Amino acid sequence: MDIKEEIKNSIRLSEVIGKNISLKRRDKSNYIALCPFHKEKTPSFNVSDDKGFFHCFGCGKNGDIFTYVMEMENVTFVDALKKLADQAGINYNYDTFSENPKLKNQLHLLKRVSDSYVQNLNAPIGEKVRNYLYERGINKSIIQNFRIGYSGNLKSNDYLVLRLKEEGFSISDMIEIGLVKENQNKKHTFYFQQRLMIPILNNSGKVIAFGGRLIGEGNPKYLNSPETFLFHKSKQLFGVINAKKYLNNKRLVVCEGYMDVISLTSHGYPAVASLGTALTENQIENIFNISDEAFLVFDGDNAGQNATLRVFEKYLPKLKLNKKLKFVFLPDRLDPEEFINKNGLNEFEKILDGAMGALDMIWMQGLKKIKEHDPESHALFWDYLRSKVNLIENINIKQAFRDEIEKRIKLFRKKNSNPFNKSNNLEVFNYNLFSIKRNLPKTGIEIK
């Protein structure tokens, strides 16, 4: 019996699903519930212990126990298997993983390539990249912790492929992990050349892909491995292992790219980043698996600011009690590293201190709709606030936000003022993002 079947025989599907949602028994081995994957009022989510299968007749989601854990916890198959094996008390060697020789081979090959890149960085051919890292304030300890390497030139890549073949790996193996790509004429070229190489790890610390930064001129500046059985960009966060290592009650920073993560870590901040994609709902959930509070600090340029707003739109409906994502807008089009280098760590701390919670983000966005001496724009302001609050799925949070919004609105109406009037005992916060002032009435209630 392989490990997958052993797990299925050890844990009932309803036992796993019942930890997340309330199941209603239909008969001895079948259950029905409200679907955890979409909003519905009438239960259409069916669970069968006999078949080891779930199916929602509303949204079409279906699968087995591994599919469910992968979808609900935003993890890869390997991580789902490890979690369920631990839950079932089944011992197995993750490093050898003999039940799946192909997977074992891919993990071994990825580690082998990563080790080779590290050797390149420490060799004479890596001097330029080493100097680049040192100039950015990234020391040897950080380089080692992130396993940073160098892919080398065509000659060194040819030599790497030759050695890998001698060790029993095939070109097909190398194509599957994204080291080599094949064109229409069946010719093979190297995916990463003359790039600073950063291994992307899964939650168990295994290399599953790479990110490469070009040193010097050329495009694309950043390049990720193609998606594989092991690597899914929309579900993976970069830096999770080191973020957990450096957390120690410090603030977790969410930034745009892996160089931001490495730089922030070198300054003492645990950090994670998405991998060339807009931050997804899956990745937001993964962030909260690291810390109950995180600070989104994207670049201060227009692209970074717009990306921040898109993340907020995804985050707002999914607000949870005791899970907070706060938003920071850096001034002067700076990225986090540039801001720290220019202003120092104390100023960066102040920026984090002034981070906005969800309610204040709604408020700030609403203020953009107000025009002085235009009552209709005030009505648009109120409607905007209420419509955004109505998107929140958690009933308790929604009601708390409604109460706070109503108190702020009543203060405005009572004083017969508009939010731009500085004489009405309002706290004024200056944000560079929209060149507007965010005015928060003093209600005595704080909702972050």
Over which residues does each language-model region extend?
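Conserved phosphate/pyrophosphate-binding and hydrolysis machinery centered on Walker-type P-loop NTPases
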Residues: 7-10, 28, 99-107, 123-126, ...
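Terminal peptide-recognition signature
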Residues: 35, 56, 69, 133, ...
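Structured, non-catalytic alpha/beta "coupling" segments that mediate domain-domain communication
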Residues: 73-80, 84-85, 194-212, 337-342, ...
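Phosphate-handling DNA/RNA-contact segment within nucleic-acid enzymes
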Residues: 11-13, 17, 103, 111, ...
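Conserved active-site segments centered on acidic
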Residues: 79-131
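Short beta->alpha connector loops at strand-helix junctions that form conserved
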Residues: 69, 274-277, 298-300
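N-terminal structured subdomain of primase-like DNA metabolism proteins
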Residues: 1-97, 155
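A charged alpha-helical hairpin associated with nucleic-acid processing machineries
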Residues: 202-203, 244-251, 281-294, 300-448
